[in-house]
UniProtKB/Swiss-Prot annotation:
Main location class: mitochondrion
Segments crossing the lipid bilayer: 33-53, 77-98, 113-133, 178-198, 226-246, 288-308, 320-340, 347-367
Topology of this chain in the membrane: Multi-pass membrane protein
Cofactor: heme b
Record-listed heme b b566 binding positions: 97, 196
Cofactor binding annotation: Binds 2 heme b groups non-covalently.
Gene3D superfamilies per record: Cytochrome Bc1 Complex, Chain C
GO function terms (MF aspect): metal ion binding; ubiquinol-cytochrome-c reductase activity
Classification lineage: Eukaryota, Metazoa, Chordata, Craniata, Vertebrata
Protein name: Cytochrome b
Entry's Gene Ontology BP terms: mitochondrial electron transport, ubiquinol to cytochrome c
Family: Belongs to the cytochrome b family.
Record function comment: Component of the ubiquinol-cytochrome c reductase complex (complex III or cytochrome b-c1 complex) that is part of the mitochondrial respiratory chain. The b-c1 complex mediates electron transfer from ubiquinol to cytochrome c. Contributes to the generation of a proton gradient across the mitochondrial membrane that is then used for ATP synthesis.
Amino acid sequence: MTNLRKTHPLMKIINSSFIDLPAPSNISSWWNFGSLLGVCLIVQILTGLFLAMHYTSDTMTAFSSVTHICRDVNYGWLIRYLHANGASMFFICLFLHVGRGLYYGSYMFLETWNIGVLLLFAVMATAFMGYVLPWGQMSFWGATVITNLLSAIPYIGSDLVEWIWGGFSVDKATLTRFFAFHFILPFIIAALAGVHLLFLHETGSNNPSGLCSDADKIPFHPYYTIKDILGVLLLILVLTSLVLFSPDLLGDPDNYTPANPLNTPPHIKPEXYFLFAYAILRSIPNKLGGVLALVLSILVLAFIPFLHTSKQRSMMFRPFSQCLFWILVADLLTLTWIGGQPVEHPFIIIGQLASILYFLLILVLMPITSLFENNLLKW
């Protein structure tokens, strides 16, 4: 009798994706982040569902409903902080996952990579709308500033902003629709993640060497299931430590003040994981230019496969490209720091230089260095 997991229509799909999947024998812990992102998404959907049971998307009661969740609902404080800090963990895993893809040349799987870029945009949109929901000062002003950027679009800009707002300012209509979108988007993200996996399993995983691993495959279960469980346990350890010891470490104190349209906070800044993009936005004095740079800072990832000039896929054996990669990482950390600083000297010039370096590295220096390394192979 054939095993049920190989014959049952539904089990067959699960089996070919998570049990009998042929995987390269040499993939490192950098390949754990895909499964960690899946765990993060499940945690976010579950905690979000329980929060939505008690939350009210009305400007008069939104702030107090969040307070009610933290004070009166059984373990409401835990659910709320798991959701808020879970988002931070989600983005940390996302950035490490993308970084892994850049370093080891996983972007050569075009369909998988492009769906990944789309997923990144979807997750960023979801996180932005979620940040608006508690209706604190930073929620309100963050929503006002970021939605206002669309007014930079020529001709249709101002109409578009008012259409998104549902009025002449960020108000009840905006909050209600943001809640609706924030609720539906994670399910769209889950569907996209399924497509992401579908495309990945068409080609099989990449590996650190960047070479074809067809000659040396091992089954996903038990080898990588055990490895993934270790990653999940570490993720849970970090998340619970953050939630139970310093839940407000990554938050903004201004968001504990109810939204007040008549009082602007001294420094409007987004959540920790958006600061690098915010720094790029602020470093360009022109509004439209800033918006384009903001979008391009993520969209540039979609161009990377076409800028691959190296004869080798991975950076494992390319020391010069490795140097540039780590300079890019340092540059992103610099941008993150700048995004949280006030707009004054010397932060303005540092932000501008870091923004120029970011695009220069990806679009110019890395492809040229790859060509140089190709020539070194001839020696």
